Structure formats: structure tokens, C-alpha cells
């Protein structure tokens, strides 16, 4: 049995399914009327959550070096021709472990999963060989002074367990995004080699599209 690539829309990929889009592999976590929540299958880079001194809010995603990196990734995708509306804005709740909400809720086109989201979807997420950052702060400046960890950020270990680590540790960045359910993606299918869109000659494909448009 050989693996063949099949083209389909993201809406047809089951939750937990692996697919390829924009030259990257992702796992689909969930879907709603707005689109599909996906997570990078692999680590894109390894870096501190925030490097350097920031005595006020060192574990605030909004001020993090990770978000600067992800902003650059988004810019690279659009510069290479991917429409900006491929990346649907989604909200990230920055509530800390103790329930403090001073960091608020932010909206990005590319970001990180929260601790609560990881708790919901962990069964669907493939393990990787390096720990990776979540968006959730362990504590914030407004939390109880007896709560240690106002510089801590939650992360996922290689075995899938959760830890809180200092924001200047170097861990993996595994982006979360929201894609349209209509986005065309590629999936691997094990079976006898059969029809595969990639095998169709371009002229035949264009002719078929034209004929269907004229119907």
C-alpha cells in the first residue's frame, strides 16, 4: 500500500486529521461556522518566549518575542501570495492559572494555543521531540504574592504533560491558526494508487473547470 496525496477542502478533513497547506503540515483540531482551528504538526522554531528584562509583564503574549516571530511568519506568507483572509482572526484568552484577567483577550491571525485549549484537544495533538510554548501565563502581577511564577509561561513537554517555565527559556513555537473550511489542502491516503489531482494534466484540469463554470 502506498501513500498518495489527495486534494480536498479543509472542511472535509476530520478533527485530528493531518493535512498540508501553505507548504506546512497541520493537524485540524476543531471547526465552527467561522472556520477551522488548526495547529502546526511540527515545531517551526525554538526560542525564548521573551528574552531580556521586562519587569512589568514578562509573560504577556502581547509583548513577547514569540509574537514578533509569528508576525514575521504571517508577513512571509502574504508576501509569497497567500491572501490575508486565509488567516482568520481568532481570540486568545490570556487569563492566568489563578484566574487573573489583566492581560485580557487578544485577537490575532496567528498565535499559540492556551492551556485550556490544550486540555481540550490534547488527544488530537501529535507529540513532538521538544517542549513547546502555550499562550497562558502561570501568574500575572496582580496575582497573589504567594503565587510564585509571574514570569512563568505554560508549555507542553515531549510526553504531552504540562509545565510552567521561565519566559526566557528556549522552547518550541508551534503556531495555532484559523483557516477557512473552504481552503484547499492535501491529505495523505494509504491505498492503491488511483486518482490524484496532482496527476491530472494542467490543460485537462483547466478544461474541466471551464466546462463546469459554463454549466
Q: What are the roles of these predicted feature ranges?
A:
Residues 1-205:
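Collagenous Gly-X-Y triple-helix signature in extracellular proteins
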Residues 206, 210-214:
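Residue-level detector of alpha-helical secondary structure
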Amino acid at each position: 500500500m502506498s501513500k498518495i496525496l489527495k486534494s480536498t477542502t479543509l472542511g472535509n478533513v476530520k478533527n485530528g486529521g493531518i493535512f498540508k497547506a501553505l507548504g506546512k503540515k497541520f493537524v485540524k483540531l476543531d471547526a465552527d461556522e467561522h472556520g477551522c482551528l488548526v495547529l502546526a504538526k511540527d515545531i517551526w522554531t525554538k526560542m525564548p518566549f521573551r528574552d531580556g528584562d521586562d519587569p512589568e509583564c514578562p509573560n504577556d503574549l502581547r509583548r513577547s518575542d514569540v509574537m514578533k516571530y509569528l508576525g514575521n511568519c504571517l508577513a512571509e506568507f502574504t508576501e509569497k501570495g497567500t491572501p490575508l483572509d486565509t488567516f482568520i482572526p481568532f481570540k486568545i484568552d490570556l487569563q492566568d492559572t489563578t484566574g487573573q484577567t489583566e492581560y485580557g483577550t487578544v485577537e490575532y491571525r496567528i498565535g499559540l494555543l492556551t492551556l485550556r485549549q490544550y486540555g481540550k484537544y490534547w488527544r488530537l495533538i501529535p507529540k513532538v521531540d521538544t517542549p513547546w510554548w502555550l499562550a497562558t501565563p502561570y501568574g500575572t502581577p496582580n496575582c497573589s504574592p504567594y503565587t510564585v511564577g509571574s514570569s512563568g509561561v505554560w508549555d507542553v513537554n515531549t510526553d504531552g504533560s504540562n509545565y510552567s517555565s521561565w519566559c526566557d527559556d528556549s522552547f518550541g513555537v508551534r503556531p495555532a491558526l484559523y483557516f477557512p473550511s473552504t481552503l484547499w489542502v492535501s491529505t495523505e491516503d494509504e491505498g492503491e494508487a488511483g486518482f490524484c489531482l496532482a496527476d491530472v494534466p494542467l490543460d485537462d484540469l483547466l478544461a474541466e473547470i471551464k466546462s463546469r463554470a459554463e454549466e
